[in-house]
Amino acid sequence: MEATPSLACANKCVFCWRHHKNPVGREWRWKTDDPTFIVDEGVKTHIQMIKETKGIPGVRMDRWEEAHTVKHCALSLVGEPIMYPRINEFLDELHKRHISTFLVTNGQHPDAIATLRPITQLYVSVDAPTPESLEAIDRPLFRDAWDRLRRSLRSLKDKGQRTVARLTVVKGWNSDEVEGYANLIALGHCSLVEMKGVTFCGKSDASNLNMSNTPWHHEVIDLA
């Protein structure tokens, strides 16, 4: 299941496939739904989506039935999940149902990362190797965005759990400065580094990216 407890984010990344339809903010200022309600509705909606695939040619019924039981939850659908004020209760609710948790954060809320309870896998997005490129790519609302990212990465080494530095490669924007990436990743002693090429999702008034910014697979491998 892919879900999020927060639609809001403190960045306006040039590669955001949501085309910036979600709200932005540096702190939470919206209605706070109950964690159990969010999980209940998320699971219910997930099951409804699975049911709608029953008549598709090639669907195996054993796999279809298995998919009704949520075993894993990726908190990366939209927005910044760690902004949700009751994030730890939300994660506890998933764990009580024996659902593993994979949370992706943009690294702009280091204090929330420090107080986050153990989860299955914690990702921090490392979108740029320098302060200047971070400002250009993430277009953060926080003026101290670079410092926040570095603090977030430093806190990973104290988490005592599996952690990941996630890089989204945008050709011509952040596809060089390998040493800068290496220095950032080293701050967190990350268990893993996940690297992916940006996917061009069509023209948007909020960004001037085009297909030329999508790297070839071999270019991503070379950077890795």
Label every model-predicted segment.
Residues M1-F37, E41-K44:
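Canonical Radical SAM [4Fe-4S] cluster-binding loop centered on the CxxxCxxC motif
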Residues F37-E65:
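Short Fe-S-cluster ligation motifs
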Residues G42, H46, I50, L153-L156, ...:
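Hydrophobic, Leu/Ile/Phe/Ala-enriched alpha-helical segments that form helix-helix packing faces
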Residues G55-H218:
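Conserved AdoMet/S-adenosylmethionine-binding subsite of the radical SAM
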Residues H218-A224:
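C-terminal accessory regions of radical SAM enzymes
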